[in-house]
Curated annotation (Swiss-Prot):
Keyword DNA-binding applies: no
Family: Belongs to the protein N5-glutamine methyltransferase family.
Family matches, as Pfam families: Methyltransf_25, PrmC_N
Transmembrane regions listed in the UniProt entry: none
GO biological process: biosynthetic process; methylation
Protein name (record): 4-amino-L-phenylalanine/4-methylamino-L-phenylalanine methyltransferase
Annotated signal peptide: none
UniProt catalytic activity: 4-amino-L-phenylalanine + S-adenosyl-L-methionine = 4-methylamino-L-phenylalanine + S-adenosyl-L-homocysteine + H(+); 4-methylamino-L-phenylalanine + S-adenosyl-L-methionine = 4-dimethylamino-L-phenylalanine + S-adenosyl-L-homocysteine + H(+)
Pathway(s) served: Antibiotic biosynthesis
Length: 292
């Protein structure tokens, strides 16, 4: 008697075991196998359960073999999901990370609070916008906000503009250090996930070090080069009392707020750990002039 062909559900279990055996965490392995299977089935991940009792799609194991080399699942399928929204990627574009969802939720809450207090169109700027992850998500969740983003990489800026279609977010290609001079002193909220990995530090996963663009990762010997630049840009852009939310490394929980406090431009600057990294919250003071 011929044995029954394995179902997709059985293949998911087997693939998850292979990925965990290759050093990928169990949670990530489960999420990745579902993303790969959904792509192979040509359905959204949320609809994958309708396929589980059926046969294994021909491309599924090809995708799994690529993932076993530590190629990110998002690069294999060409898109990523962030806070439930799909973001198309492209070669050379930074893959959004789940830990950035925490800073994004914080930003949404702050924008919603501004709207409740009577700010009709709170202005938010996303520096180093990548594929538009934060900017587009903020525009979707707080449609009353005016959302602008800037990204240096031409490939990433193109991807961000595609992802922003229909959301109201506006993405420009350019250097975040010189962002939006016409808005100096008027912005309510700045968000940024700048490069912050020190040159030579190899603690990040192969998915990051070997597949994300170097422009989005490395930031000098201490990992503070772009953070210093973003401090100056945010201080210039923000209105007094405006807030900066900045993602940084877990190893920078002390050095980043110290850097901000030393400038005298912030009435508050503190960092908290997130699931894998850190997030700085800084409030622009009313007394110190913006940087020249």
């Amino acid at each position: 008697m011929t044995a029954a062909a394995p179902t997709l559900a059985q293949a998911l279990d087997e693939a998850t075991g292979q990925l965990t055996g290759a050093g990928i965490t169990a949670d990530a392995a489960r999420a990745d196998t579902r993303l790969l299977a959904a792509h192979a089935c040509q359905v959204a991940p949320g609809d994958l359960d309708t396929c589980l009792a059926g046969p294994v799609p021909p491309r599924f194991w090809h995708y799994v073999r690529r993932r076993l080399t530590r190629e990110p699942a998002e690069r294999i399928v060409g898109h990523a999901y962030f806070m439930g929204h799909r973001f198309d990627l492209a070669p050379g574009v930074f893959v959004p990370k789940p830990e950035t969802e925490e800073i994004t939720r914080d930003a949404i809450a702050r924008l919603e609070a501004l709207v409740r207090r009577g700010t009709t169109a709170p202005l938010v700027v996303d520096l180093c916008a990548g594929p538009g992850t934060m900017a587009v998500t903020l525009a979707r969740h707080v449609p009353a906000a005016r959302v602008l983003g800037i990204e240096l990489s031409q490939a990433a800026a193109r991807a961000a503009r595609r992802n922003a279609r229909g959301t109201g977010a506006r993405i420009v290609q350019g250097d975040a250090r010189d962002a939006f001079p016409e808005l100096s002193g008027t912005v309510d909220l700045v968000v940024t996930n700048p490069p912050y990995i020190p040159i030579g530090l190899r603690t990040s996963a192969p998915e990051v070090l070997e597949h994300d663009p170097p422009l989005a990762l490395w930031a000098g010997e201490e990992g503070l080069g772009m953070i210093r630049a973003m401090e100056r840009t945010a201080a210039r852009l923000l209105a007094p009392g405006g807030v900066l939310l900045l993602e940084h490394g877990s190893y920078q929980l002390a050095s980043v707020p110290a850097l901000f406090r030393a400038t005298g431009r912030w009435s508050h600057a503190s960092s908290r750990p997130t699931c894998n990294d850190g997030c700085l919250t800084a409030v622009r003071n009313h007394t110190c002039a913006p940087p020249a």
